[in-house]
Amino acid sequence: MTQTGATGSEPAKETARSSSADKSRPLPPADLAGVPVYCSWSGGKDSALALHHALRLGAEPRLLVTMLTEGGERSRSHGLRRELLETQAAALGVPISFGAATWAGYEDVLRRELVEAARQGLRTGVFGDIDIERHRDWVESVASAAGTRACLPLWQRSREALMREVLDLGFQAVIVAVREDALPPSLLGERIDAAMLRAFEAAGVDLAGENGEFHTFVVDGPPFSGAVEVDLGERVLRDGVWFVDLLPRHPSG
């Protein structure tokens, strides 16, 4: 894990970070203690694990930020229903906000969402990126343009180690999308386990799905007050990716 922006002396606390000169510099994860944060939120394993690490480091998550399709009904990245993400946020005990955008307008809308977070006093954002430099450059740029700074608790961790940690911590991650040329649609709705990771490794599939091989939705884990109950809906193929429609399970009667 890198310590971007760290120096040999202890960095100043959050009260001193709000100056225009340094508030947009990336924040070393070790400096999260006592810092109110927003979390970039897909609903999947990486954002959930980043949230867990932020909590363990003493951060105070105040808001989840999720991007939806232009109609505002499903998440832009994973195709998850808005209602499902709201149920997940309730189980985490963290409010959630949504921005709706086309892919072309994605960056502008996200920046506006982060500007609003900054207005609420949240000048640090937690992101779940692992080791792709162009992704890090992009999130740091967008966060900075909104007057906030990015913190990446998972940065440069081994992908295998992160996936083992997901399992060891008890996160329950359901496969909600698979790339048609990488994995079979029969995996949709399955929960990631050790046997699945071994199969991925044998097939040459990235264990963390960093190349878009698969996406997940986390239904339970350390930060959750209770499991998010779901049912499986129809499967659809869109632009070379299989998706399953995950439905929030409502109590009968």
Residue ranges and their predicted role:
Residues 2-5, 10-253:
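Nucleotide-activated chemistry modules centered on ATP-dependent adenylation/adenylyltransferase
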